[in-house]
Amino acid sequence: MPIIYMNIMLAFTISLLGMLIYRSHLMSSLLCLEGMMLSLFIMNTLMALNMHSPLTNIVPITLLVFAACEAAVGLALLVSISSTYGLDHIQNLSLLQC
């Protein structure tokens, strides 16, 4: 296995570990989630380049679109929570509240 793939998998693992450790703050969770999406995007791009198939080129672009939508929704949620509560703690959220 080439070292670039090992580095990308290590970046994904560190981002996943950060997501598990810093799950109480929304901003930290969003940053770790973006790190995971970035490492998945780079891995999919490298795989598509190695396969030399035009059908595999759409997968990284689709993943990039999903990452952009996730970032927009996450930042909107962060702004809404921080303006309402003044904090970015996830325990302030509840689906039972109106």
Swiss-Prot record:
Residue stretches spanning the membrane: 1-21, 29-49, 58-78
Catalytic reaction(s) noted: a ubiquinone + NADH + 5 H(+)(in) = a ubiquinol + NAD(+) + 4 H(+)(out)
Cellular component, GO, one term: respiratory chain complex I
GO biological processes: ATP synthesis coupled electron transport
UniProt keyword annotation of Cell inner membrane present: no
Domain of life the protein comes from: Eukaryota
Enzyme Commission number(s): 7.1.1.2
The keyword Mitochondrion belongs to this UniProt entry's keyword annotation: yes
Keyword tags: Electron transport, Membrane, Mitochondrion, Mitochondrion inner membrane, NAD, Respiratory chain, Translocase, Transmembrane, Transmembrane helix, Transport, Ubiquinone
Compartment annotation: Mitochondrion inner membrane
Topology versus the membrane: Multi-pass membrane protein
Enzyme class, first EC level, given as a word: translocase
GO MF term (any one): NADH dehydrogenase (ubiquinone) activity
Protein role: Core subunit of the mitochondrial membrane respiratory chain NADH dehydrogenase (Complex I) which catalyzes electron transfer from NADH through the respiratory chain, using ubiquinone as an electron acceptor. Part of the enzyme membrane arm which is embedded in the lipid bilayer and involved in proton translocation.
Assembly notes: Core subunit of respiratory chain NADH dehydrogenase (Complex I) which is composed of 45 different subunits.
Protein family: Belongs to the complex I subunit 4L family.
Protein name: NADH-ubiquinone oxidoreductase chain 4L
Native species: Colobus guereza
